[in-house]
Amino acid sequence: MSLTAKDKSLITGFWQKISSKADDLGAEALSRMIVVFPATKVYFSHWPDLGPGSPSVKKHGKVIMAAVGDAVGKMNDLVGALSALSDLHAFKMRIDPGNFKTLSHNILVACAVNFPVDFTAEVHVAMDKFLAALGAALSDKYR
């Protein structure tokens, strides 16, 4: 599914509104994923605390959303822009690529909860398409 010019405009505009809270959104999305999908805990077993708001969750949530923000600026070549991250997740960390969809869903939930006025139906669709494309780009090295 490709992103239209309108999708890209909506994504860029929404990101500008939420970017100042991106670290918190990332921590919330990651916390939600770990709680709601406990099988994902296996990837973070080296962390001393997996609880919502823990330093490790906050730190990695920030890393995740920094990568999402970087991808917003590189929407025209997500596979190229995320090549190194795809390598890391596929070969070093061995993350099941299905988890990208799970995390994307939780990012959408965090955005909807924290930005109910700005997270319109149109923005929701555009962000869902974007995060699906981002997940597909991260899964590129798995093939």
UniProtKB/Swiss-Prot annotation:
Recall the GO molecular function terms of this protein's record: haptoglobin binding; heme binding; metal ion binding; organic acid binding; oxygen binding; oxygen carrier activity; peroxidase activity
Lineage, top-rank taxon, reads Eukaryota
List residues modified as N-acetylserine: S2
Pfam families from the entry? Globin
User: Which SUPFAM superfamilies does the record associate with it?
Assistant: Globin-like
| Keywords of this entry | Acetylation, Heme, Iron, Metal-binding, Oxygen transport, Transport
Where, by residue number, does O2 bind? H60
Describe tissue expression: Red blood cells.
> Which Gene Ontology BP annotations are present?
hydrogen peroxide catabolic process
Which part of the chain is the Globin domain? 2-143
Record's keyword annotation contains Transport: yes
Quick one: which residues bind heme b? H89
Question: Mind telling me which Gene3D superfamilies this protein's record contains?
Answer: Globins
- Family (UniProt): Belongs to the globin family.
What function does the entry list? Involved in oxygen transport from gills to the various peripheral tissues.
The record's note on quaternary structure and interaction partners says:
Heterotetramer of two alpha chains and two beta chains.
What is the protein's given name? Answer: Hemoglobin cathodic subunit alpha
The organism encoding this protein is Anguilla anguilla (European freshwater eel)
